[in-house]
Amino acid sequence: MLQALLIFVLQIIYVPTLTIRTILLVKNQTRSAAGVGLLEGAIYIVSLGIVFQDLSNWMNIVAYVIGFSAGLLLGGYIENKLAIGYITYQVSLLDRCNELVNELRHFGFGVTVFEGEGINSIRYRLDIVAKRSREKELLEIINEIAPKAFMSSYEIRSFKGGYLTKAMKKRALLKKKKDEHAL
């Protein structure tokens, strides 16, 4: 029984660790992923080793499987809370909607406006880049001002230049000055 509990706890730790390592690899943070992978490998070997010691012990096998499943739920929750990386939203509008553009820029979102040809009329597309941790805030602003907008999104692997890079540098400097004044 104690072994089964240990296996369950190890799986609850192992699977979210696996999730985080995978995310770091996808985000091109290979050194961090390698560090997390050390922990992941150690947990995997210990947990599976206990199970393989006695394959007739069904409690250990059930603990492994249920722990794995619970770990997936926890890993997904952690991934959503960490919200590592950036996202781009493409927002299609019937009109230019300067109110939305100005509001998004006011709150620090990078917005580029494009004019295009729709099937029946001119359409406008906003390309908006944001940290994933601010996605909910972004969607609230869009839904408040342009609730009928068509939106699609994708995650960004990397980027260079543009408003967002300048804004990040500016925020970092302001934070540094604020921290220095706090001391």
Swiss-Prot record:
It is found in: Cell membrane. Keywords: Cell membrane, Membrane, Transmembrane, Transmembrane helix. The chain crosses the membrane at residues 6-26, 32-52, 58-78. InterPro entries: DUF2179, DUF5698, UPF0316. The keyword Transmembrane applies. One of its GO terms (cellular component) is plasma membrane. It comes from the Bacteria. The keyword Translocase does not apply. It is a multi-pass membrane protein. Pfam families: DUF2179, DUF5698. Belongs to the UPF0316 family. NCBIfam families: PRK04164.1-4, PRK04164.1-5. HAMAP family: UPF0316 (MF_01515). PANTHER family: UPF0316 PROTEIN YEBE. This is UPF0316 protein BcerKBAB4_3093. It comes from Bacillus mycoides (strain KBAB4) (Bacillus weihenstephanensis).
